[in-house]
C-alpha cells in the first residue's frame, strides 16, 4: 500500500517494496515521551513557544485528538515523522506517554513526509519554506516546474522562494526571526552586492522601513551605482590575443579527438582567465 505522499512524489519499485513490504496496521500505541526524538529533517527551525503553550492548554482540556506519527530507531528510540508541536506541548504538561502511530519509513520518505506536512500547514517562515522546496528538489531530483505541479503551486512561486536562499545568511536569519518580511527580502535581491544588502537590511530594521520605502531605497542605490564611472579595462595586447587564440585552437583539437572538454572565459581588470574542465570519461 502506498503512503499518502507517494501520490505526489513517486518512488521506485524497490523503495515502495522497502516502505510497504511489511504490512502496517495503523495501531495507536502509547509510547514514552522521553524515548521520542525530533525529526532530523524537520524544516521548521523556529517554534513559537506561545503557540506551543496554547496547544498545551487545548490538549489538557480535550486530549490528543490526532496521534503523532513516529518511526522506530535501532537504539529503541522513536523519531517523529509528524506531530512535533504536539510532542512539545505534552512535554510542557509533564505527560510521560503520548499516543502514536508507528510507521516503517526510510530516510527519504521520512524527510518527504515532514517537509510536505509542514508545507501544507502554511505556518513556515518564507526561508523555511524555501529550504523545504530546495530539499524536496534534491531528494526527488525534480525541476522547479515539476515540484510546482506536484504541490499544486505556480512555478513562479517556487522560483521566488528559492531566490531567497541566494541572499546573505544575515538576511535569511532576519527572515527566519520575522524581523523583515518576504517582500523586504525580495527587494534586497535586486542589489546583488552583499555589502549593500546588509547595509540596507540594518537600515530596514533600525528605521522600521516598510516595503515601499525599502524598494525606493533599493532604486536609489542602484541609480547611484550606475552613475559611478566604470574603470577602463586594459586593452588586449597582440601577445595576449595570440595566447588566447592558441588556447582556443588547442581546445578545439582536443574536442575533435573525442574528449569532452568544457571551458569558461572571464575578463578581469588585470588578467584574462580561462578555466578548463576535462571529463575523466
From Swiss-Prot:
Where does this polypeptide localize?
Cytoplasm, Nucleoid
Keywords attached to this Swiss-Prot or TrEMBL record, sorted alphabetically, are: Cell cycle, Cell division, Cytoplasm, DNA-binding, Septation
Lineage, top-rank taxon, reads Bacteria
Q: Mention any one GO cellular component term assigned to this protein in its UniProt record.
A: nucleoid
The record's annotation in InterPro entries points to:
Chromosome_partition/occlusion, HTH_ParB/Spo0J, Nucleoid_occlusion_protein, ParB/RepB/Spo0J, ParB/Sulfiredoxin_dom, ParB/Sulfiredoxin_sf
Q: Which Pfam families match?
A: HTH_ParB, ParBc
What SUPFAM superfamilies is this protein classified in? KorB DNA-binding domain-like, ParB/Sulfiredoxin
Q: Spans of biased composition, class Basic and acidic residues?
A: 12-26
Disordered, as annotated region: 1-26
Its BP terms in the Gene Ontology are:
chromosome segregation; division septum assembly; positive regulation of sporulation resulting in formation of a cellular spore
Task: Specify the DNA-binding region ranges.
Answer: 145-164
Q: Name one GO molecular function term.
A: DNA binding
User: Gene3D superfamilies this protein is in?
Assistant: 1.10.10.2830, 3.90.1530.30
Its main localization is cytoplasm
- Which family does the record claim for this protein? Belongs to the ParB family.
- What is the recorded function of this protein according to its Swiss-Prot or TrEMBL entry? Effects nucleoid occlusion by binding relatively nonspecifically to DNA and preventing the assembly of the division machinery in the vicinity of the nucleoid, especially under conditions that disturb the cell cycle. It helps to coordinate cell division and chromosome segregation by preventing the formation of the Z ring through the nucleoid, which would cause chromosome breakage.
Q: What is this protein called?
A: Nucleoid occlusion protein
